[in-house]
Regions:
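Active-site-adjacent structural patch at catalytic or cofactor/ligand-binding sites
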Residues: 60-69
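A generic structural motif
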Residues: 68-74, 130
Length: 131
């Protein structure tokens, strides 16, 4: 299993431990609108860059995690952001063939989406090394 799949699986497994619906791709209708039942968390893009040198074979990555709420206030989305933080920030996630060196939240924002729902985004930065 490649590093990209390993990281995706580890993040997904950590997030499903919290009592929320978690998707790696939320279901959509033909027009691209979400058909997922709110509230939910969605794993967005995970961008990788090599971090190799003579001593270390690894990757750095940035993972974007989305929270979606239709509760009528930002509070639910912010609470979801807190649950995501608790599940991932400085977590020791098991990864087959990799060692997680670092995982930390860098940014978190909640804003109103065009459909009047609330959309939160957390960005996490991590580093992994091959074992």
């Amino acid at each position: 299993m490649g590093a990209e799949v390993t990281v995706q699986k580890a993040i997904y497994d950590a997030l499903i431990a919290i009592p929320l619906r978690v998707y790696d791709a939320a279901p959509q209708d033909a027009d691209g609108g979400s058909t997922a039942m709110f509230p939910y968390v969605e794993i967005g893009f995970i961008a990788f860059s090599e971090m190799d040198d003579k001593a270390v074979n690894g990757f750095e990555f940035v993972a974007r995690i989305h929270s979606r709420s239709r509760s009528g206030s930002m509070m639910e989305a912010k609470e979801m952001q807190g649950q995501i933080y608790a599940a991932l920030h400085h977590a020791e996630l098991p990864m087959a063939g990799q060692r997680l060196v670092l995982l930390r939240r860098e940014t978190s924002i909640v804003e109103r989406a065009p459909d009047r729902s609330f959309h939160g985004v957390c960005e996490f930065r991590g580093q992994i090394e091959a074992t």
